């Protein structure tokens, strides 16, 4: 497992900001955030268990709570407490579970494109991706991903870099049983009950043009949390930290400081 800690540019600042990725699980998802947020915080990013090409197989009953326990262990091993947290989709739910399991470890939460319960539309998207992986192969699974993550115009304008990233992802693809175990754990997770118990100040951000998660699900999650605010962005797609990085960074920072 890879854990990366980037010191704050201001050495007097020790507050840590933790970033947790979505279904892909890789730390490099947050590359557009590193330089900006290390002006204000120490930043921790990590590869989630099972996402490397040479990863051991995950257990057959792998659950979202296992991902939360993994992050708790990372924070404790690095002597970190009272961190701010930013999580994307699956990563957002890791934050919810950590806030429930070990509330003292987190201070403020930012949840990007989460849901209160799995929408039928999102389930159809997940089932389609699973079918591609099981019946067509790794290449089709990886190359379809952009359709769910990014707006059409962004895909058109970034064809070369996107193709390069896809080719690298195919070569470095995780064991297929791990990808399916992680997807099934996300499909099975019910965040609504846990969210209602989380008392941390929370910002939920959804995107109106998200082609994977209807933004109304983010609003519903916000309404189920005692201390949450909701921000709806007009554009950016599901991965707006990539496509609208500057706007997202400013929105997140304004909430955290």
Placement of each model-derived feature along the sequence:
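Active-site loop/oxyanion-hole signature of alpha/beta-hydrolase fold enzymes
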Residues: 44-86
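Conserved alpha/beta-hydrolase catalytic His-Asp/Glu region
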Residues: 120-122, 140-194
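Flexible "cap/lid" loop of the alpha/beta hydrolase fold
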Residues: 100, 107-136
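Catalytic histidine-centered segment of alpha/beta-hydrolase-like enzymes
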Residues: 236-245, 249
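Gly/Ala-rich beta-loop-alpha elbow adjacent to hydrolase catalytic centers
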Residues: 87-91, 95
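Short beta-strand/loop motif that positions the catalytic acidic residue
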Residues: 198, 204-206, 210
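Conserved HGGG/HGGXW glycine-rich cap/lid loop of the alpha/beta-hydrolase fold
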Residues: 5-57
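Conserved alpha/beta-hydrolase "acid-adjacent" motif
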Residues: 211-217
